[in-house]
């Protein structure tokens, strides 16, 4: 994430008309690190403080600084929240256990994100105030959920109760990232992009488009998904259950604050 921004800005500066070329970089909500309630609201201007071991966030911070100090006249940096895309309901990776159930996100619908980029690229009269700015990218108030709530909604859409698929303490209780934005509406004012899509309908569309092997998950015998799918996933590298099983001191300290807190 560090090399490309530097390469792109250098390439723009080498053009005969660099001041007329816009350079947009994509950052992440991860740049501001762990935001536990009651500090779960955030804005551009908050300290950049990535979570422990989050090299992704660290690289995004370096990339953001590179673009800001590139010397270009037209640049913008978009700190994207979690992207609600077609495959989000199918994610089965131990990294999902890094999310804290009491954490929050203001999701960005993938169609909204695409519309924003399209509007910037195709509108040569985009509001001049947009350039030379850093923005939080989210789909607004309807898309603000706690992680527990959004997971519950997605599992319910498959016809199951989340509590039958995994236990609460299979997930970290700290050291993730996420916040609800106090300032994401400002980007919408400058470059309108939000569709106002209903979250529940969007979840239903994702589930309806999933393979049949996945949509049948809610009708499996109780404990089947939990013990034969979710538990083995959580025991893989980077999974919280593996940290606990192996009593990994660094992992347990980072994601739970100690073995007794798990």
Task: Please provide the spans of the model-predicted regions.
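Conserved Rossmann-fold NAD(P)-dependent oxidoreductase catalytic core, especially the SDR/UDP-sugar
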Residues: 1-55
């Amino acid at each position: 994430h560090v090399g490309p921004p530097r390469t792109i800005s250098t390439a723009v500066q080498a053009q005969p008309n660099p001041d007329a070329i816009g350079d947009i970089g994509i950052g992440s909500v991860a740049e501001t690190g762990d935001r536990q309630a009651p500090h779960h609201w955030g804005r551009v201007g908050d300290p950049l403080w990535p979570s422990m071991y989050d090299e992704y966030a660290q690289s995004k911070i370096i990339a953001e600084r590179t673009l800001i100090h590139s010397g270009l006249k037209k640049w913008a940096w978009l700190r994207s929240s979690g992207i609600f895309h077609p495959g989000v309901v199918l994610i089965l990776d131990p990294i999902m256990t890094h999310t804290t159930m009491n954490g929050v996100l203001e999701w960005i619908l993938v169609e909204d994100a695409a519309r924003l980029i399209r509007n910037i690229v195709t509108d040569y009269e985009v509001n001049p105030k947009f350039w030379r700015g850093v923005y939080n990218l989210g789909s607004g108030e309807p898309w603000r959920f706690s992680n527990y709530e959004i997971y519950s909604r997605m599992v319910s859409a498959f016809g199951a109760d989340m509590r039958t698929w995994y236990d609460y303490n299979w997930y970290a209780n700290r050291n993730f990232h996420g916040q609800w934005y106090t300032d994401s509406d400002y980007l919408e004012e400058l470059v309108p992009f939000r569709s106002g899509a209903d979250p529940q309908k969007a979840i239903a569309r994702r589930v309806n488009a999933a393979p049949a092997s996945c949509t049948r998950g809610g009708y499996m015998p109780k404990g089947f998904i939990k013990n034969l799918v979710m538990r083995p996933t959580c025991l893989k590298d980077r999974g919280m259950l593996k940290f606990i099983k192996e009593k990994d001191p660094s992992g347990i300290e980072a994601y739970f604050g100690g073995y007794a807190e798990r």
